[in-house]
C-alpha cells in the first residue's frame, strides 16, 4: 500500500492510500525504458503488459514507474505487474457484468469501479465527474488512466469513533498460542 498526501484547493490536504497496482498510464515511462520491448502498451485498449518471454529482469521498468507498480519475480527472473485481468475482462464466456478485474469484483466495500472513461456516458465516467476524480501525482506527467476519488464526507455521529478495546485472553482454558500472544503483547 502506498500513501500520498493530495492537496485540493477546496478541501485542503488529505492522505490517499492505494494498492501497488498498475495505473496503465497513457505515457508509461516503464514502457519507454524497457530495452527489450517486453514492457508494452496495447494499442487497442491501452493496457500496459509485460511479455514474460522477452523480459530479461533488468528492473529498469521498476525504477521508471513512479507508482511502484512493478514487482520482480525472483523465481522466474522477470518483472510482473497488474494485467488489469485482461484475460477476464475480454472473456466472451463470462456474462458482461462479470468482466471486471478481480480487484473490483472482490473489493469488500465496493470502493473500486471499472469501465470506459473514454465514454462520457459510462457509469464510471459519471462517477468520476460527479465526485471530482483526479490523477494521482499529475506532476509526473504519466497521464494514468485510473482516477482517484476524494474521500466521501464523514457520516454524522462517527467522529472520534474508535475500534472496541481488545481484552487480553487470560482464561486458563485458552490455547498455548493465545496465552503466548497475550504474554508477548502485555510485555
What residue ranges belong to the model's regions?
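Non-ligating segments of multi-cofactor redox enzymes
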Residues: 1-187
Amino acid at each position: 500500500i502506498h500513501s500520498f498526501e493530495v492537496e485540493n484547493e477546496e478541501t485542503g490536504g488529505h492522505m490517499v492510500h492505494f494498492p501497488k497496482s498498475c495505473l496503465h498510464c497513457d505515457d508509461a515511462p516503464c514502457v519507454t525504458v524497457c530495452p527489450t520491448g517486453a514492457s508494452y502498451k496495447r494499442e487497442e485498449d491501452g493496457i500496459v503488459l509485460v511479455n514474460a518471454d522477452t523480459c530479461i529482469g533488468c528492473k529498469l521498468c521498476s525504477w521508471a514507474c513512479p507508482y511502484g507498480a512493478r514487482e520482480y519475480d525472483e523465481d522466474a527472473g522477470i518483472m510482473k505487474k497488474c494485467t488489469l485481468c485482461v484475460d477476464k475482462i475480454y472473456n466472451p464466456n463470462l456474462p458482461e457484468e462479470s468482466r471486471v478485474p478481480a480487484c473490483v469484483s472482490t473489493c469488500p466495500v465496493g470502493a473500486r469501479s471499472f469501465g470506459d472513461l473514454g465514454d462520457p456516458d459510462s457509469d464510471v465516467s459519471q462517477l468520476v465527474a460527479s465526485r471530482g476524480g483526479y490523477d494521482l501525482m499529475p506532476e509526473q506527467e504519466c497521464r494514468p488512466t485510473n482516477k482517484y476519488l476524494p474521500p466521501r464526507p464523514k457520516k454524522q455521529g462517527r467522529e472520534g469513533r474508535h475500534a472496541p478495546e481488545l481484552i487480553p485472553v487470560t482464561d486458563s482454558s485458552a490455547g498455548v498460542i493465545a496465552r503466548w500472544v497475550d504474554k508477548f503483547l502485555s510485555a
